[in-house]
Amino acid sequence: MNKQMLLLILLCICIGCISNKSESDLLNKKNPIGIYGNFSSTEKIQNIVDLISNKDVLINKEVKVRGLVNEVCPMRGCWLEVVDENGIDKLRIKVTDGDIVFPLSAKGRNIEAEGQFSILTLNKQQAKNWKKHLAAEKGIEIDTSEIILSQNDYFEYRLNTTGAKIF
């Protein structure tokens, strides 16, 4: 009986391992519609313009935002750039690498996401390194000495996300 039980446990483990999708499978998922992470439908939804306009009040607070996915991290699906309906104001939705994998097919889709709102402030060298890193994720090599920064390159609005709904 112990051998049968052990065999059953091993079989369950093997089936569980086989059915888990790899990070690559999740990144290349054809249909992005769905819930990612822990997402609730109870909080008031902010648009990105209002969030940024009220940043002094909302900084480090839990918020829920709605926008349009403009870009997806091509390496691990660990961030999304989301724009408001005006297409100008943007927010980076960031998750812990591997906790949630947003598919590349999410680009152009609507999203609601919740998490802690923050502002990442960068000095000149950090801003250049960040731009170099973002380019490298796309397979583009650039020399930091050739990067020209704008005022907007010294900070980034972020939502450290615990859950999202893509629709």
Question: Residue locations for each model-derived region?
Answer:
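Bacterial Sec-dependent N-terminal signal peptides
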Residues: 1-27
